[in-house]
A protein has these predicted regions:
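A surface-exposed partner-binding patch
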Residues: 1-106
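Compact, glycine/acidic-enriched structural inserts
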Residues: 124-127, 136-147
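A broad, low-specificity signal marking well-ordered, structured residues that form hydrophobic/aromatic
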Residues: 96-97, 109-110, 123-126
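Broad, structure-driven detector of short, well-ordered beta-strand segments within folded domains
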Residues: 107-117
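Short, surface-exposed beta-strand/loop "edge" segments at domain boundaries and coil↔beta transitions
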Residues: 105-109, 132-139
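Short, flexible loop/turn elements at secondary-structure junctions
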Residues: 101-103, 116, 129-132
Length: 148
């Protein structure tokens, strides 16, 4: 299955020093999945193969609080570091993978929620509000639908 055929990921994500990383290897992917305890969805891997993290270009994506997408890296700002921060320090529920930074600086997050997956095994996307007792709202059936 091809992902993101209707989205120009290179326009959506801007490279930067905080959230963009060099292309990842299969070993990097395996280490990330082992560290966070979740297998990354194929759509997220496909996105990160095009651009391994970065800030959101609001000219392309202007109706969301998402400000960056985490890349595969063990460095600061990478998925391993940020997963640990949100799950262990901020005590978000471990229902899946927090995949990007929000404009609220952590008071709410978007997660790939594995409690519900579509027919292709892709997790739904939820918004979790840390300030409202981690209330969960479904926002999209999968990552591609979320970014369209």
């Amino acid at each position: 299955m091809a992902y993101f055929e209707n989205i120009d990921i290179k326009k959506l994500l801007e490279e930067d020093e905080d959230y963009s990383f060099p292309p990842f290897t299969e070993k990097d992917l395996e280490e990330t999945e082992k560290a966070i305890g979740w297998k990354l969805p194929k759509s997220y891997i496909a996105l990160l193969k095009i651009q391994n993290g970065g800030y959101i270009n609001y000219e392309e994506f202007d109706e969301c609080w998402l400000s960056a997408i985490y890349g595969i890296s063990s460095s600061e700002g990478g998925l391993i570091d940020m997963f640990d921060n949100w799950i262990n320090e901020w005590e978000y529920p471990n229902i899946g993978i927090p995949f990007g930074e929000t404009q609220s600086a952590g008071h709410d997050m978007y997660f790939m929620d594995f409690s519900s997956v579509d027919e292709n095994g892709e997790p739904r996307i939820v918004h979790i509000d840390n300030e409202a007792d981690n209330s969960i709202d479904v926002v999209a059936d999968n990552l591609e639908d979320f970014l369209i």
